[in-house]
């Protein structure tokens, strides 16, 4: 996504 959403730095 580009932001840390649900502990996923993507």
Curated annotation (Swiss-Prot):
Tissue-wise expression: Nacreous layer of shell.
Highest taxon, organism lineage: Eukaryota
Protein name: Uncharacterized protein SMPP15
Record organism: Nautilus macromphalus
């Amino acid at each position: 996504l580009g932001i840390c959403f649900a502990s996923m730095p993507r």
